[in-house]
Amino acid sequence: ALLNSSSPSAFYGMYAAPGSIQSNYNYSEADQFSVKLATAMTLGNHEVKIGFEYEQRNNRSYGVAGDDLWYLMRNLTNFHIDQLDTENPEIVSHDGFVDTIIYKRKYNGDSQYQFAQNLRKALGLSETGIDWINTDSYDFNDNSIEYYDENGIMHKAYLQDGFDISMFTPDELTQDGNSYVSYYGYDYLGNKLKKQPSFEDFFTEQDENGNYTRPVGSFRPIYMAGYIQD
């Protein structure tokens, strides 16, 4: 069995196996603005020609690695509860003898990712709870997903609208230099930018939750040329 985002190995490293994943998604747009001017005049025995050309391209692109998002979700969802709360053990005893010592998961809000908060909220779970969510159990037929409560009992919850890339922040989608999304001229969700951001905006612009939006402007090279001919 393969986990979500995993793909079967190629035959002898040469041929793709049946079931190989092809999930990258990309789109782009390009337009061009151009102005050309030319004139000529006679000055005595000279015919002088003057010309000028201005051209600006505007290229934008957006891409997402769909299969890798499963890997990212798996890493982010329970990252903040991957340690045990050893300071608060629960002792189970029978007839005066200690039978079992239980350590529940420890919640660490400082290490909780925005995706983890958004997913728990969408599932109707406490954002500060220690429920262990199994993202690989997601059922496309009814949008159900399995999770284990603090006592290790399995339950099901439902994502009414399924997973959405807006659950992530831009930094989560580009962390450690990994290109889960790539974009310029669009925002990290794939929406066309309404204005050209500045270089500083990439480092300073934040949303209402204090997350950096990381806008990247479209590629807009300018070409200019002029000539004078006698």
Show the residue positions of the predicted features:
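Intrinsically disordered, low-complexity acidic/polar segments
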Residues: 48, 59-61
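Membrane-spanning beta-strands of outer-membrane beta-barrel proteins
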Residues: 30-32, 223
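A cross-kingdom feature that marks long, compositionally biased intrinsically disordered regions
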Residues: 25-29, 38
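Transmembrane beta-strands of outer-membrane beta-barrel proteins
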Residues: 46-52
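Feature marks flexible
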Residues: 1-24, 64-226
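Outer-membrane beta-barrel channels and translocator barrels
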Residues: 30, 43-44
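Transmembrane beta-strands of outer-membrane beta-barrel pores
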Residues: 43, 54-58
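Residues on the lipid-exposed face of transmembrane beta-strands in outer-membrane beta-barrel proteins
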Residues: 35-41, 226-230
